[in-house]
């Protein structure tokens, strides 16, 4: 993958426009989870250290496009950055007709979604963004799968368009896991729906030596083996698709599970064989035997790609399966890469972040890259590198 990297450029005195992913949860004007800002800080600090005139922007939430809405302002992000950086930081609301930035100063440009045409990759808006800078740095892997004015359009018109350190690291890590993985390679696909991850399962079945399914996805495979899944979340119309996958690749289907008669945090967990599920029960976690079987597979893996939990780990009574699997990944000596919001929440809960080789900041972009789809922002950077 050939792109210009920000780390290869001299940024001194240059106007640098960084598109970061600062889309963080905010409550009462305060950032409640700073993982994405923390991940972006090294890029911002590197540009400031080089004496660049630095602008950074992002989207935050889903405001009505083209309208300012205080609820979705980047002000809480600015306040967070002021605490972390020794450089001056200020928020600018109206910047499309130009903005003055001093060398060594950080200007945060207000939420890009307040600009009409952002999501449609509007050419006139893209050109206005491009006119603000000498160097455009795309560093938001989480939005690289969307062709929008601040992630894609600007890059076509900026004098220089490059990949930031975070984006470059994401692409390197995913390339390492998918292009030439150390073997055996194990891929875990969990979460609730087969339909949204079917193409991912299909793509991975061609790369991975071992495919593991968990969560609601696994329930569809349990049903495909002819078991009653009661009130469990599963997709009846995809049972045949699950059967096809089972016939073409080795997928361990749970043999024991934890069930409940209601979907709630206080529901009682009952451990039982998949042969004994009643009509009023729903599968909410893997059983100990099934979870341990997966842990044994993971122990010997040289590459692990993890997307999605294997049970409703948010409920303490249905956490054990995901915990066993998470700890097995943490203890593995292989290269592990994890992505997706629920996966990151599980990593935080079990305190294993330092034991995962690479944690991807992208959800949708992570999955689309795994599927082998072209990410528009990355394709644009490759195109610009050829010019």
Curated annotation (Swiss-Prot):
Matches recorded under PROSITE patterns: PGLYCERATE_KINASE
Gene responsible for this protein: pgk
Reaction it catalyzes: (2R)-3-phosphoglycerate + ATP = (2R)-3-phospho-glyceroyl phosphate + ADP
A molecular function (GO) term: ADP binding
Annotated residues for binding of ATP: 197, 314, 340-343
GO cellular component: cytosol
Name of the protein this chain belongs to: Phosphoglycerate kinase
Protein origin, superkingdom: Bacteria
Localization in the cell: Cytoplasm
Family: Belongs to the phosphoglycerate kinase family.
Subunit structure comment from the entry: Monomer.
UniProt-listed GO biological process terms: gluconeogenesis; glycolytic process
Lineage, broadest ranks: Bacteria, Pseudomonadati, Pseudomonadota, Gammaproteobacteria, Enterobacterales
Annotated Gene3D superfamilies: Phosphoglycerate kinase, N-terminal domain
Keywords: ATP-binding, Cytoplasm, Glycolysis, Kinase, Nucleotide-binding, Transferase
PANTHER family in the cross-refs: PHOSPHOGLYCERATE KINASE (PTHR11406), PHOSPHOGLYCERATE KINASE 1, CHLOROPLASTIC-RELATED (PTHR11406:SF23)
Pathway(s): Carbohydrate degradation; glycolysis; pyruvate from D-glyceraldehyde 3-phosphate: step 2/5
Record EC number: 2.7.2.3
Natural source organism: Klebsiella pneumoniae (strain 342)
């Amino acid at each position: 993958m050939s792109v210009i990297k920000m780390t290869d450029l001299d940024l001194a005195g240059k106007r640098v426009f960084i598109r970061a992913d600062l889309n963080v949860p905010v409550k009462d004007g305060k950032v409640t989870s700073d993982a994405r800002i923390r991940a972006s800080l090294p890029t911002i600090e590197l540009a400031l250290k080089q004496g660049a005139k630095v602008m950074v922007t992002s989207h935050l939430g889903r405001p009505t496009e083209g309208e300012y809405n205080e609820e979705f302002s980047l002000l809480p992000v600015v306040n967070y950055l002021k605490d972390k950086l020794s450089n001056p930081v200020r928020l600018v609301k109206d910047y499309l007709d130009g903005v003055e930035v001093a060398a060594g100063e950080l200007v945060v440009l207000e939420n890009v979604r307040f600009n009409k045409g952002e999501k449609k990759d509007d050419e006139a808006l893209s050109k206005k963004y491009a006119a603000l800078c000498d160097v455009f740095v795309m560093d938001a892997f989480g939005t690289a799968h969307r062709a929008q004015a601040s992630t894609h359009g600007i890059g076509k018109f900026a004098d220089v368009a490059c990949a930031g350190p975070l984006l470059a690291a994401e692409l390197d890590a995913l390339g390492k896991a998918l292009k030439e993985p150390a073997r055996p390679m194990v891929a875990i696909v969990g979460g609730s729906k087969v339909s949204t991850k079917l193409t991912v399962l299909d793509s991975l079945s061609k790369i991975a030596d071992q495919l593991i399914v968990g969560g609601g996805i696994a329930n569809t495979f349990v049903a495909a083996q002819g078991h009653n899944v009661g009130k469990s979340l599963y997709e009846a119309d995809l049972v045949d698709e699950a059967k096809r996958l089972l016939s073409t690749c080795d997928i361990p289907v749970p043999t024991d599970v934890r069930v409940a008669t209601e979907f709630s945090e206080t529901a009682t967990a009952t451990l039982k064989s998949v042969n004994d599920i009643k009509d009023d029960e729903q599968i909410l976690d893997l059983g100990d035997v099934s979870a341990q079987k997966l842990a044994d597979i993971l122990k010997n893996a040289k590459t692990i790609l993890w997307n999605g939990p294997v049970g409703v780990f948010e409920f303490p009574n249905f956490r054990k399966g995901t915990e066993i699997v998470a700890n097995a990944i943490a203890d593995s000596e292989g290269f592990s890469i994890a992505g997706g919001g629920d996966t990151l929440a599980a990593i935080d809960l079990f305190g294993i972040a330092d034991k995962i080789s690479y944690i991807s900041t992208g959800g949708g972009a992570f999955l689309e890259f795994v599927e082998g789809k072209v990410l528009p922002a990355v394709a644009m950077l490759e195109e610009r590198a050829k010019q």
